[in-house]
Amino acid sequence: MAEKEKIKRNRREEILQALAQMLESSDGSQRITTAKLAANVGVSEAALYRHFPSKTRMFDSLIEFIEDSLITRINLILQDEKETFNRLRLILLLVLGFAERNPGLTRIMTGHALMFEQDRLQGRINQLFERIEAQLRQVLKERKLREGKGFIVDETLLASQLLAFCEGMLSRYVRSEFRYRPTQEFDGRWPLLAAQLQ
């Protein structure tokens, strides 16, 4: 019984990896059908539905992976790093680096892969970015408590500016067919961003 469950889990992972790879390829700029996905995996559409009740559920699983990866690591950054600007820099680098290592998932993060899917999926991505923005805002607000100095500009505005930078870099990555890496020249960009936060 355990062996059967392991095979099923492996097939599920194989399906999700195939979907992510298709999103990374030129197929990712178009609607991915279950027929195309089944052909890519080398199984029938019926076999896909034995592992996932719908394509929406496949996207849900990929979004869950994105959420778990980012939020877990953001929490580790907040736990390990105490200095405000280092926290912010590491959170931005985390989001950009994750996208760079997972181009297919970046299409989901930017919403490009979800244009032809259920609105609920886009809502989940919106919630993810709202959570990241809330974390950035909290880091900014905690500066006064941790370091004894606040910001001239409202923390809400600053957090949205940092998130907009991230989202812009992810969109550029997708638009360029993954040529312009999100972390490219980050070391030069960060001082410009940090200067806006003073």
Swiss-Prot record:
Keywords: Cell cycle, Cell division, Coiled coil, Cytoplasm, DNA-binding. Signal peptide: none annotated. The keyword Cytoplasm applies. Residues 33-52 bind DNA. InterPro entries: DNA-bd_HTH_TetR-type_CS, Homeodomain-like_sf, HTH-type_TetR-like_transc_reg, HTH_TetR, NO_SlmA, SlmA-like_C, Tet_transcr_reg_TetR-rel_C_sf. Residues 117-144 form a coiled coil. GO terms for molecular function: DNA-binding transcription factor activity; transcription cis-regulatory region binding. The keyword Cell cycle applies. GO terms for biological process: cell division; negative regulation of division septum assembly. Pfam families: SlmA-like_C, TetR_N. HAMAP family: NO_factor_SlmA. Belongs to the nucleoid occlusion factor SlmA family. Required for nucleoid occlusion (NO) phenomenon, which prevents Z-ring formation and cell division over the nucleoid. Acts as a DNA-associated cell division inhibitor that binds simultaneously chromosomal DNA and FtsZ, and disrupts the assembly of FtsZ polymers. SlmA-DNA-binding sequences (SBS) are dispersed on non-Ter regions of the chromosome, preventing FtsZ polymerization at these regions. This is Nucleoid occlusion factor SlmA. It comes from Serratia proteamaculans (strain 568).
